[in-house]
């Protein structure tokens, strides 16, 4: 089975919260669990200096980009909208470097939530900085529905590298940003 490198999420701390004095990279246990249940080994890769991705990439067969804070609109040529949430330029730079390195090494990439949005931006796409700027009929914010309850359907095109994913299933969503213009070579 494969070794999956999940790019960590920085824990942006505030004083008096756990770890406030240290930077922490983490991932949700559910990401680890799902890949382990499928027989894969998981390594969580810390957000680091962009030049260090070359040291991590040889350790994994595939990478996963997870959710988190908003993708900076500067990356797709827009000014911040009033509804833009927190961004993380260090994470943006590191994950963009990871995408570039993985593509150059022909390693598959799975983008989930923010990860998918960043992949779109990498390929020249843009985002709606907030759902209020689009007419989407999909419920992207779950409240008051519990987080673990799926609320909408998705379909996944079968690719050899991620054939373990089902073709059709339901997912939950916590987005307030969505794809506006699809990146070059991507399919919706």
Swiss-Prot record:
GO biological process: polyamine catabolic process
Highest rank taxon of the organism: Bacteria
GO terms of molecular function: gamma-glutamyl-gamma-aminobutyrate hydrolase activity; transferase activity
Pfam families: Peptidase_C26 (PF07722)
InterPro entries the UniProt entry points to: Class_I_gatase-like, Peptidase_C26, PuuD-like
CDD domains for this protein: GATase1_2 (cd01745)
Keyword Mitochondrion on entry: no
Every Glutamine amidotransferase type-1 domain range: 17-188
Keyword set, alphabetical order: Glutamine amidotransferase, Transferase
UniProt xrefs under PANTHER family: GLUTAMINE AMIDOTRANSFERASE PB2B2.05-RELATED
Listed name of the protein: Putative glutamine amidotransferase-like protein YvdE homolog
Source taxonomy: Bacteria, Bacillati, Bacillota, Bacilli, Lactobacillales
């Amino acid at each position: 089975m494969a070794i999956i490198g999940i790019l960590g999420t920085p824990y942006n701390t505030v004083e008096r919260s756990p770890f406030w004095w240290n930077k922490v990279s983490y991932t949700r246990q559910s990401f680890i669990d799902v890949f382990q249940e499928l027989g894969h080994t998981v390594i969580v890769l810390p957000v680091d200096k962009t030049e260090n991705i070359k040291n991590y990439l040889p350790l994994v067969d595939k990478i996963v980009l997870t959710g988190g804070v908003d993708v900076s609109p500067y990356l797709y040529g827009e000014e911040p909208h009033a509804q833009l949430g927190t961004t993380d330029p260090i994470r943006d730079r590191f994950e963009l470097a990871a995408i570039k390195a993985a593509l150059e090494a022909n390693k598959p990439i799975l983008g989930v939530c923010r990860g998918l949005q960043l992949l779109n931006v990498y390929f020249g796409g843009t985002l709606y900085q907030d759902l209020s700027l689009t007419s989407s009929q999909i419920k992207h914010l779950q409240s008051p529905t519990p987080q673990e309850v799926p609320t909408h359907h998705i379909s996944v095109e079968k690719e050899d590298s991620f054939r373990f994913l089902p073709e059709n299933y339901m997912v939950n969503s916590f987005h307030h940003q969505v794809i506006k213009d699809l990146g070059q070579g991507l399919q919706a």
